[in-house]
Regions:
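Conserved phosphate-binding loops in N-terminal lobes of ATP-dependent enzymes
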Residues: 1
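ATP-binding/phosphotransfer module of carbohydrate and carboxylate kinases, centering on a glycine-rich
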Residues: 8-16, 28-37, 54, 72-188
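Short loop/edge segments at beta-strand edges and connector loops
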Residues: 18-20
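Active-site metal-binding loops of divalent metal-dependent hydrolases
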Residues: 22, 45, 165
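Short beta-strand scaffold segments in enzyme catalytic cores
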Residues: 26-28, 40-42, 47-53
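Generic structural signal for residues positioned in beta-strands
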Residues: 48, 67-69, 96
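Eukaryotic endomembrane system proteins
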Residues: 52-69
Length: 188
């Protein structure tokens, strides 16, 4: 309850809730669309996922899809924290962008922070770099297949994508490629 105490110490006895950013993204989607049955995915430092069910409730489920396998290739990237391969966090986060950059021919400064490395790829994207676009297209392909997998668990009607990875032109490319793959591979 460290966060609740910090708020009370600073602002007094006001209502406060500490929530997962994935749950907040799903709730934001439900509120902005005026709809329910929404999967919210925040792609930033990690992949955060939340779900608002068909009745408009945050389920309270443990939606840690960051550690759900989305790539079964034995050569898939390994997550340093869990040791598992092919985890969503390696595809739908700033780390996903950073790990794909060298494969697309982009050299990033080794001494830069992860946020600075993401910004460098975003800057390349804004300047029209084909290599940076390839990074975001790849993420869009993985996202499409992962959404089909996630759908099997949640049966969502809407998806809201947020976070630094989805900002700017790169996010547009992710969404475009994701829609294309969904239409081709999962037309239903």
């Amino acid at each position: 309850d460290i966060y609740i105490r910090a708020v009370r110490d600073t602002f007094g006895d006001i209502p406060v809730v500490v929530a997962n950013d994935g749950d907040v993204s799903a709730l934001a989607g439900a509120m902005s669309l005026g709809e329910n049955n929404i999967l919210g995915i925040a792609m930033g430092t990690s992949e955060a996922v939340g779900y608002v069910d068909e009745n408009g409730n945050i389920t309270g489920w443990l939606n840690e899809l960051a550690f759900m396998p989305v790539d079964a290739n034995p050569e898939a990237m390994a997550d340093e924290w869990s040791g598992d391969i092919g985890c969503g966090v390696k595809y739908f986060s700033q780390d996903g962008v950073i790990k794909r950059a060298p494969r697309a021919g982009i050299e990033l400064p080794q001494d830069a922070s992860p946020a600075e490395k993401l910004k460098a790829v975003q800057t390349l994207m804004d300047s029209g770099s084909a290599a940076a676009e390839a990074v975001y297209r790849s993420i869009g392909v993985y996202l499409a297949h992962s959404l089909a997998l996630y759908y099997g668990y949640y049966g969502f009607k809407y998806v809201l994508l947020l976070g630094r990875v989805m900002s700017g032109r790169g996010g547009d490319v992710i969404l475009e490629k994701c829609r294309e793959v969904l239409a081709d591979e999962y037309p239903e």
